[in-house]
């Protein structure tokens, strides 16, 4: 996520000024689908009757009219960076469209598949290990520079969601692409013994953050579930062990931002909503795929900690992080996805209440009532509105509202 950590602790308008400077089981039957099983999901409503389903569709209409390009890529935003495509923005839209296909709207499949084909432009074909670059021009030229663990890991996760809703050659292509992302993670030198292990954020190797490692853990788990290859299992266990040993803050019950610096490193104890949402999902996957229910408890405890520390009980929304009280659609609504996953596992509707109220706040404060796209930042009371409309924010609001529409 090329722009993400740069933006974490500086104002959004400053971040933008930085510009384009540069996500075999032994003795076990193989699975054909990945992720949390449908058997774990609770009572659903008809998606098409849900106001959230309608809003997800309206969000996609905004994307179609304003963010999608004639090349089948997605521009960064509608104003200041219309000629550039960010890797994780594009793959987030694939992730969003896969969610719509999963709940029954197959009209989204061509958008998903066309952008997947365009993503080849961002792949590092000159390196045997491959891996996605962070950015390119919207026509697919100019991909170069640093490569990011979270970009490649998120890409693999999104492709496995697309794998779940496709068949035949298309399905095989999504699986192979997810494997290629994992191959880059395993063989590009982004994991080393600095700080006792863990993945670097990117090829510059300036920090090791929770979210890069949590997304990698998700990808390895899901590939193990599908393929049964034990090296994916072993990688997931290594990442899990490093996260538990190095990134968990027992004082808050949350995962910290990152480790950087020389020697043993300096831990940065800011807590981010999406970091902890990613870890919640990773633990739920671990519980299911590794048949270890202690990780259900870990996920539930992490959800409780999120709702204690990262939830604003006055405005009923997740904060960006503990050092920044603003709200952003993509990074804050990731918390809703985690709450929906918790509900799917244990049936506690309180999780859905948090997911819904968080989305309701974003719809109230950050949605343009005319064009129905989302702005990128505001303060809790709605002031300080940053009116850029970023592609990734639209993608995540489409995706999470599609997920919620199964239940509310």
Describe each PLM feature range:
Residues 2-12:
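Bacterial N-terminal signal peptides that target proteins for export
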Residues 19-22:
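C-terminal motif of bacterial Sec signal peptides marking the signal peptidase cleavage site
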Residues 25-142, 172-201, 237-238, 242, ...:
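Low-complexity, Ser/Thr/Pro/Gly-enriched N-terminal "stalk/linker" regions
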Residues 61, 65-68, 127-131, 135, ...:
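The feature captures the catalytic groove of carbohydrate-active enzymes
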Residues 71-98, 102, 135-155, 200-213, ...:
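Solvent-exposed loop and edge beta-strand segments that line ligand/cofactor-binding
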Residues 91-107, 154-169, 215-229, 278-292, ...:
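Well-ordered alpha-helical scaffold segments within catalytic/enzyme domains
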Residues 272-290, 295-310:
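Oxyanion-binding "anion nests"
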Residues 295-338:
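A beta-strand-loop signature enriched in Asp, Gly, Thr, and Trp
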């Amino acid at each position: 996520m090329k722009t993400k950590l740069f933006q974490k602790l500086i104002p959004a308008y400053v971040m933008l000024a930085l510009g384009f400077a540069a996500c075999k089981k032994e003795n076990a039957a193989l699975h054909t689908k990945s992720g949390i099983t449908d058997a774990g999901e609770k009572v659903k409503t008809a998606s098409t009757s849900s106001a959230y389903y309608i809003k997800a569709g309206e969000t996609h209409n905004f994307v179609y009219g304003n963010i999608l390009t004639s090349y089948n890529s997605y521009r960064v935003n509608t104003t200041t960076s219309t000629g550039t495509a960010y890797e994780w923005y594009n793959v987030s839209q694939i992730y969003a469209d896969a969610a719509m296909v999963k709940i029954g709207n197959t009209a989204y499949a061509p958008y998903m598949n066309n952008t997947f084909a365009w993503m080849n432009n961002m792949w590092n074909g000159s390196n045997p290990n491959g891996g996605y670059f962070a950015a390119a021009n919207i026509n697919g030229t100019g991909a170069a520079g640093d490569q990011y663990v979270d970009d490649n890991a998120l890409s693999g996760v999104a492709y496995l969601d697309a794998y779940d809703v496709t068949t035949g050659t298309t399905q095989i292509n999504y699986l192979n692409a997810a494997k290629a992302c994992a191959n880059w993670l395993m063989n590009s030198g982004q994991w080393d013994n600095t700080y006792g292990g863990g993945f670097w954020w990117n090829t510059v190797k300036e920090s090791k953050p929770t979210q890069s490692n949590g997304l990698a853990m998700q990808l390895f788990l899901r590939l193990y579930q599908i393929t049964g290859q034990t090296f994916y299992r072993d990688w997931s266990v290594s990442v899990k062990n490093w996260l538990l040993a190095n990134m968990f803050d027992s004082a808050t019950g949350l995962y910290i931002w990152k480790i950087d610096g020389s020697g043993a490193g300096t831990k940065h104890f800011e807590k981010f909503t999406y970091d902890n949402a990613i870890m919640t999902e990773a633990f739920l996957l671990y519980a299911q795929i590794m048949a270890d229910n202690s990780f259900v408890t870990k996920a539930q405890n992490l959800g409780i900690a999120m709702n204690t520390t990262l939830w604003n009980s006055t405005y009923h929304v997740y904060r960006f992080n503990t050092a920044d009280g603003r709200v952003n659609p993509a990074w804050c609504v990731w918390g809703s996805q985690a709450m929906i996953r918790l509900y799917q596992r244990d049936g506690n509707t309180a999780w859905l209440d948090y997911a819904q109220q968080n989305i309701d706040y974003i719809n109230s404060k950050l949605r343009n009532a005319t064009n129905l796209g989302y702005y990128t930042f505001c303060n809790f009371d709605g002031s300080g509105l940053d009116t850029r409309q970023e592609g990734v924010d639209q993608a995540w609001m489409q995706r999470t509202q599609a997920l919620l529409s199964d239940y509310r």
